[in-house]
A protein has these predicted regions:
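Primarily a LysM-type cell-wall glycan-binding module
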Residues: 450-487, 492-509
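Membrane-lipid interaction segments
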Residues: 2-457
Length: 509
């Protein structure tokens, strides 16, 4: 080959796949007490945790567990008990484009839980939504320039490369104690949910520091007359430092997930109660580098053999876009016909199930259904009453989401206030976390071959542009410098229209 090709080996991180799937996870446990005791399930909830994710050819294998907690009464109708159980799962998710031994980011959330009692055994079932993103880091030799004996015209493009060069992860156990109001008359703490938010990331010299807040909603059995159940809300800060293994990177990022929650109440010694909470957090940290590279987009020679290029289409990760936001909401619920009237509200639980989302400028619009469980007391019975309802929601968040982002929507600070005996106002806060990557699609030239070209005779030509032609395609067709072509047609605009006449002067050296 007479032409000389300039090449450079580029290490790039490519987003290979994105997928979503649902898994049904079931578990069972034997309840304490006698088989003849009447048992009623009041509420069933749970959380899902992904322990490992492995990438295969066009698929990913996820392993994890669902931690169930079920509130129920047994025997005495006004005594609320809890049972917790864990069910493991292994789920294969279709992930077109995924490659063996590639990196997989997976996230799980429980969208629905139901439980039933049969023969002294509690059967539990959870519907788990799984979101998966695949990525791989590859080295690719790309063309950055070309030199030819008779001269050559080159067109370049700039690509931005962001890749993870160091990572680390660790589990940290957050222990906190909270004083419970004496007026609640807490007998025992039954269960709790927790959520974690990152507020600050610092680091350097192979370390990353992650700080944030954990919010805890605890459910307690109470000795208050007519109120066997109470709910309290708490906050606690957390801080974790991770050692990063790998190269040095100046762009730091972190994720935190709640992996388990354990709560108990104990006497404080002065007649009050203290809530002891242990929250197991999984913290992941990464360090990225970002660089810009100018590569060859196209080229042609002025004379002699023509160049034919081969290349590869890639989707390159150029940045990270993660954001969180919260919006409060409320709705009025009309209890179904035949439902016992509301005397006093005990607790309310809500799970948002997002069915659609779209971005409008810097806002993300979501809609879906709220799956609601109301626990309350009625005048006609000393046992708590459970009502399950669904209501639609539409909420707009001040978040700019990247395409194919992994979006998590949760509800907390859920509170139900009776309006009348058959109407309840539900107040809640929806918290959204958007985890996405910014990408750039590019066709990268990797090699070139020479082939015989039809020579253009010297002379002065008047050509008329066809649809889709521009200055580059005309100059390439006649094998003349683009600068010479523009100089001969100084009055023509940068964007040529179909039918525009262009003067071309072809003169061999």
């Amino acid at each position: 080959m007479d032409a000389q090709l300039r090449k450079e080996t580029v290490t790039m991180e490519q987003v290979t796949a994105h997928g979503a799937s649902q898994a049904v996870v079931e578990g069972e446990i034997t309840l304490p007490g006698g088989l003849r005791e009447e048992t009623h399930v009041l509420h069933a909830g749970g959380m899902a945790v992904v322990d490992s994710a492995e990438s295969g050819a066009d698929r990913a294998t996820l392993s994890g567990k669902v931690i169930f907690h079920v509130l129920y009464t047994q025997g005495a109708p006004n005594q609320v008990h809890v049972v917790e159980a864990t069910a493991d799962f292994i789920h294969q998710c279709d992930l077109p484009g995924a490659q063996p031994k590639g990196r997989v980011q997976a996230q799980a959330r429980v969208e629905h839980v139901d439980a039933s009692v049969q023969g002294g055994r509690l059967n539990m079932r959870a519907i788990v939504q799984l979101d998966v993103r695949g990525a791989s880091t590859q080295a690719l030799e790309v063309l950055t320039g070309v030199n030819a004996p008779g001269g050559a015209e080159v067109a370049t493009q700039e690509i931005a490369l962001r890749r993870t060069v160091a990572s680390g992860q660790a589990d940290t156990l957050l222990r906190e104690e909270f004083e419970l109001p004496e007026g609640l008359q807490v007998r025992e703490t039954l269960c709790a949910d927790a959520a974690a938010q990152i507020s600050n990331i610092t680091g350097g010299q192979g370390r990353i520091g992650v700080e944030g807040t954990v919010t805890i909603s605890a459910v307690h059995a109470s000795d208050l007359p007519g109120k066997p159940l109470v709910v309290t809300h708490h906050e606690a800060p957390f801080s974790q430092t991770l050692e990063l293994s790998g190269e040095s990177g100046d762009l730091l990022d972190a994720r935190v997930t709640v992996r388990d929650v354990a709560v108990a109440s104990q006497d404080a010694g002065d007649g009050g109660k203290t809530l002891r909470a242990e929250v197991l957090l999984g913290v992941q940290g990464t360090a990225d580098t970002q660089e810009k590279l100018t590569v060859l987009r196209d080229a042609y020679t002025y004379q002699g053999a023509a160049l034919t290029f081969s290349g590869r289409d890639v989707v390159i990760r150029t940045g990270q876009r993660r954001a969180s936001a919260a919006e409060s909401g409320k709705t009025t619920l009309l209890l179904p016909d035949g439902t016992p009237p509301v005397r006093g509200m005990l607790a309310a639980f809500a799970t948002p199930i997002m069915t659609a989302q779209d971005s409008t400028g810097s806002r993300l619009n979501t809609e879906g259904m709220l799956e609601i469980t109301l626990l309350y007391m009625t005048d006609e019975n000393t046992a708590p009453v459970t009502v399950h309802q669904e209501t639609p929601f539409r909420t707009s968040f001040a978040v700019s989401a990247a395409p194919d982002s992994i979006i998590t929507l949760t509800a907390d600070e859920v509170e139900a206030v009776p309006i009348t005996s058959d109407r309840v106002e539900l107040r809640y806060v929806l918290r959204l976390t958007c985890d996405g990557v910014e990408t750039q699609s590019a066709h990268l030239l990797t090699d070139a071959q020479e082939e015989t070209a039809d020579e253009v005779d010297d002379g002065l030509y008047l050509c008329y542009c066809q649809t889709g032609e521009d200055w580059w395609t005309l100059a390439k067709e006649y094998r003349v410098p683009q600068e010479t072509l523009r100089r001969l047609n100084p009055d023509l605009p940068d964007a040529l229209k179909a039918g525009t006449g262009v003067v071309v002067w072809k003169k061999s050296p």
